Every structure is written in structure tokens, then in C-alpha cells.
Amino acid sequence: MTTVCTADQMRAAEQTWFDAHPGKDLMAVAAHAVAVEAEQMLGAHEGRRVLILVGGGDNGGDGLFAATELASSGHSVELLSVLGIPHAEGWRAALAAGCRQVTPTDVLHQRYDLAVDSVLGIGGRPGIPRVLMRTDEWLVKSGTPVL
């Protein structure tokens, strides 16, 4: 993994964004950017299978709102909660958009066109939970592209 910036540098960048965009929703902007990149990775095909790896906190919220956009675009989107309590509003929105919750066991027997990692953000701590390690190992072995 390549370090792009530290958590403190990212917090400072976020604060700069908030200062420049008072009243705007950074999560909505981030989720839309993730959905746009996911669409580019999926190509011009509807009905692709997408797995969203969901963590607690705002990073998970970004992924859930991106999942909502992807489902609204006609993709089959599944949600795997792997760490913490998912962002409540994002979880409700994703389920209402037709996304489906799956278990780690479900995932191991499926094929996906894309996986979106929205587990850890700037609040992440050292040590990777076992379920996330197993899921990451499966993704590598399956050749599933990860955003």
C-alpha cells in the first residue's frame, strides 16, 4: 500500500473543503465521485454485480450512498458490513434503492464485476479484523477489481 497522505493531512484537507463550501455535504460529493469511478470501471453495461464492503463511520457512508447511485443505475448491488455499525442513513437509503445485505459466507460463493472498499477511512486503527482479511484474500484470489 502506498501512503498518499497522513490522517492529519486528510483532516486538514477536509476542513479546507468545508471552509470553501459552507453548507455542502462532503459525503454526497464523495459518494457521487465513487459511483462515477465505479461506473467507469464497470463499462457501459447495466446489471453488473457490485459488492460494497461497508465499515462504520463516514467512509462506510460514502460507500453506501455510492451503492444507492449504482443500484439506481441498474446494477445489482450487495452490501457486506465488515467493521463497526454502518452509517444508519446510508444503510437505509441503500436498502431502499434495492441493495441487498449479504454475509461473508454468501460472498465467498459469488462472482462480482467490482468490489468497492468503503471500510476504513481516516479513523482507521492498526490491526485488520479477521473477516476483512478473509474477504480481501478472497477478492485477490477471485480477480475481482477493487475500487
Task: Please tell me what each predicted stretch does.
Residues 1-5, 43-147:
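Glycine-rich phosphate/dinucleotide-binding loop and adjoining beta-alpha-beta core of small-molecule
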Residues 1-48:
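Positively charged, low-complexity intrinsically disordered leader regions
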